[in-house]
Amino acid sequence: MRLKPLGDRVVVKVIQSEEVTKGGVILPGTAKEKPQQGEVVAVGPGQYIDGKRVEPEVKVGDRVIFSKYAGTEVKLDGEEYLLLRESDILAIIE
């Protein structure tokens, strides 16, 4: 199944944080930080401002940092994705 975002929405595959600390302690799900990094897997066509479509700045394959509590979580085929507005993306990792 493919997701095709609309407007200025972006689909990001969440990159999970380590489950084991450097000291070897296994972290339970409740102790882990909410992920803030991911890889862009789909991008919408952009939003309209003053009647003109503005293309998104991110593209498929970009690794990005996003706001901790932004977006809508979606689980498809056992994979976790976030559906974000482009404005929820804080930076592109180069």
From Swiss-Prot:
Keyword Chaperone included in the entry's annotation: yes
The UniProt entry's GO biological process terms, in alphabetical order, are: chaperone cofactor-dependent protein refolding
Task: Name a GO molecular-function annotation.
Answer: unfolded protein binding
As for subcellular location, the record says: Cytoplasm
Q: Which domain of life is it from?
A: Bacteria
Q: Which NCBIfam families match?
A: PRK00364.1-2 (NF001527), PRK00364.1-6 (NF001530), PRK00364.2-2 (NF001531), PRK00364.2-4 (NF001533), PRK00364.2-5 (NF001534)
Q: Does the keyword section mention Cytoplasm?
A: yes
One GO cellular component term, please give it: cytoplasm
Key words of the record: Chaperone, Cytoplasm
Q: Which organism is it from?
A: Caldanaerobacter subterraneus subsp. tengcongensis (strain DSM 15242 / JCM 11007 / NBRC 100824 / MB4) (Thermoanaerobacter tengcongensis)
Please explain the role this protein plays, according to its UniProt record. Together with the chaperonin GroEL, plays an essential role in assisting protein folding. The GroEL-GroES system forms a nano-cage that allows encapsulation of the non-native substrate proteins and provides a physical environment optimized to promote and accelerate protein folding. GroES binds to the apical surface of the GroEL ring, thereby capping the opening of the GroEL channel.
Indicate the quaternary assembly.
Answer: Heptamer of 7 subunits arranged in a ring. Interacts with the chaperonin GroEL.
Listed Pfam families: Cpn10
Query: Could you say which protein family the record assigns here?
Result: Belongs to the GroES chaperonin family.
The encoding gene is: groES
What name does UniProt use for this protein? Co-chaperonin GroES
Main location, first listed in the record: cytoplasm
